[in-house]
Amino acid sequence: MKTHLKFKNTNIGIVFTLLLTAVIADGCTSNKKQITFSEHIAPIIHKNCTSCHRPGEAGPFDLISFNDVRKKAKTILKVTQSGLMPPWPADTSYQRYIGERYLTQVEKQLIFDWVDAGCPEGPPGPEAPVFPAGSQLGVPDVIIKMEEPYLIQGDNKDRFMVIKIPYELERDTFLKFVEFVPGNRRLSHHVNGHIIQYSINDKQNIFEGPRVVNREDVGTLDSCYRFLKLLNDDGTYPLLTPSVFNYLPGVTPQIYPSGVGGYRIKKKGAILMRDIHYGPTPKNATDQSYVNLFFDSVPPKRPFMETQLGTLGISEIVPPLLIPPDTIMKFVTKAIIYNDISLVTINPHMHLLGKSFLAYVITPSGDTIPLVRIKEWDFRWQYFYTFRNMMRIPGGSVIFAEGVFDNTVNNPNNPFSPPREITGLGGSMRTTDEMFQLILTFLPYQQGDENISLENVTPQMKGIQ
């Protein structure tokens, strides 16, 4: 049976209809919770943005308080909806890593709705995160600091430098961790650090030679070593322990479980920042960065090993890395893994013509193991991606890397206009030349490695509770 409401008085019908509409509208509004800064937006900003966007850091403005964020609301909306910020080039639908910084669609929608509603503040709170002023790991045993501040010219140009800091310890020792602390956090954009080690009679004066050289001035790695006088006295290369630290703004140093990693080092050596990128500045500035060494009382049980595919690595690039002007080209490199390994970290590397990067493993059984996919290469953000658990790669597997390079006028990062032929054949360190590398940090596989989590490891150090 249907019930029909009829109104003899038109005015009564209109009033009833308006009241009914108001009730329905009010019901919808009450069910939709207001998006506020303190409840919804602050946790997103503090987790993904504040570590860089705070006083003295690399971000161009602060994003800490409600007023900070409200003033930049339109900018935040634009860069988050486009995916430009927070910077995380790797495709998280392809592989997952520790320390990911990206926004989910739900978080992007919250930001959109908040800005659209006029940026309401909401109730007081939450408290802004607290960041340690110096070490994030504890009290170091030794601090190795640049002897003199390095002058960064105020000419609005990026600089890619190589810096050495020689040192002499009391004796040969073991290291648990190495931590880089930038002296100028606003301009220090990324650093890849290594340790050069000298045996007692290999080099009499480890303190000779210049401390700094511009990568653009030396070209090859060999020229760099010779200019900085890093070679042994007989002209041979010293022992290099690679990738003992890596730095990007806002990135927390990676801590590994007990028994994993660590280093043996000689008493005489040098910290080699083989790739330190200073961002542009309109005014002269200085940097006097330092490195914290944390000793260990026992030798490392499972020190990391490193290899690289492609440029200066164990595998050839096909076709040879030569990119004619006005072309978009794909290059491939591959290498066989002969024994089972536990893969820990990967680092894709290209220069300014890079367009996309893909790396994966094909196992002997024909399975594919995804490593990393970067759909839109960004030279400014070259992470060392650490897997959440060690990744077992069976012996007999083949690791593939595919890189696409764009040497056209449509590439906004192309260093030349009009485009020129760009080569990567000589292993040049100049950013205007090219490289195509995949760097792997790994261990020989042990039973159960794939079950070892690399997340949320608490360092057992002095000064850490």
Say what each PLM segment does.
Residues 336, 344-430:
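Extended, compositionally biased non-globular segments
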Residues 127-196, 283-353, 413-465:
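Solvent-exposed, flexible loop/coil segments flanking beta-strands in beta-rich domains
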Residues 70, 74-75, 83-98, 190-257:
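A surface-exposed loop-and-adjacent beta-strand signature within N-terminal beta-sandwich domains
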Residues 225-297:
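Beta-strand-rich globular domains of non-transmembrane regions
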Residues 1-35:
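Bacterial Sec-dependent N-terminal signal peptides
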Residues 118-122, 279-283, 404-413:
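Short acidic/polar inter-strand loop motif in beta-rich domains
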Residues 175-176, 263-278, 391-406:
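Noncatalytic modules at the cell exterior or secretory-pathway interfaces
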Residues 28-165, 177, 269-275:
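Aromatic- and Gly/Pro-enriched helix-to-coil junctions and flexible linker segments
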